[in-house]
């Protein structure tokens, strides 16, 4: 049995009615473009992505968040098997991902105001 997350379960109604779930701002690229970017260059190093876009800060944070979520997925199975180190990496990754989500939300709010 595989786990399939319900992406709309924890989202506010306003976000669901907004249309696009993956792109909180019109200046940000789609998730398929980020998947292509990550598959071409690997996860971003120190939060910097390779590209020619003008708004590198929100893109790099979003790409970094996607990379962290990808890494978190790799830690789940060893955690279930009882690996203490995988459990600690999972905890640190969740904390880091939560802070990046806050930063991405703040960035999109700033972009929406301007």
Swiss-Prot record:
Keyword flag Cytoplasm: no
Primary location recorded for the protein, binned into one broad class: nucleus
Domain of life per record: Eukaryota
Assembly and oligomerization: Homodimer. Component of the nucleosome remodeling and deacetylase (NuRD) repressor complex, composed of core proteins MTA1, MTA2, MTA3, RBBP4, RBBP7, HDAC1, HDAC2, MBD2, MBD3, and peripherally associated proteins CDK2AP1, CDK2AP2, GATAD2A, GATAD2B, CHD3, CHD4 and CHD5. The exact stoichiometry of the NuRD complex is unknown, and some subunits such as MBD2 and MBD3, GATAD2A and GATAD2B, and CHD3, CHD4 and CHD5 define mutually exclusive NuRD complexes. Interacts with monomeric unphosphorylated CDK2. Interacts with CDK2AP2. Interacts with GATAD2A. Interacts with HDAC1. Interacts with HDAC2.
Organism: Mesocricetus auratus
Protein name in UniProt: Cyclin-dependent kinase 2-associated protein 1
Family (UniProt): Belongs to the CDK2AP family.
Recorded name of the encoding gene: CDK2AP1
Keywords: Cell cycle, Chromosome, Disulfide bond, Nucleus, Phosphoprotein, Transcription, Transcription regulation, Tumor suppressor
Residues with PTM Phosphoserine: 45
GO cellular component: chromosome; cytoplasm; nucleus
Gene3D superfamilies: 6.10.140.1300
Tissue: Oral keratinocytes.
Region (Disordered) location: 18-57
Segments of skewed composition (Polar residues): 20-36, 47-57
Compartments it resides in: Nucleus; Chromosome
């Amino acid at each position: 049995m595989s786990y399939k997350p319900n992406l709309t379960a924890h989202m506010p109604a306003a976000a669901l009615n907004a249309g696009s779930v993956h792109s909180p701002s019109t200046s940000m690229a789609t998730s398929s473009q980020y998947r292509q970017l990550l598959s071409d260059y690997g996860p971003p190093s120190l939060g910097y992505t390779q590209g020619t876009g003008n708004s590198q800060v929100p893109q790099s944070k979003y790409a970094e968040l996607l990379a962290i979520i990808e890494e978190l997925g790799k830690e789940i199975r060893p955690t279930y098997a009882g690996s203490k180190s995988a459990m600690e990496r999972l905890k640190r990754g969740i904390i880091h991902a939560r802070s990046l989500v806050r930063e991405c939300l703040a960035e999109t709010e700033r972009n929406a105001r301007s």
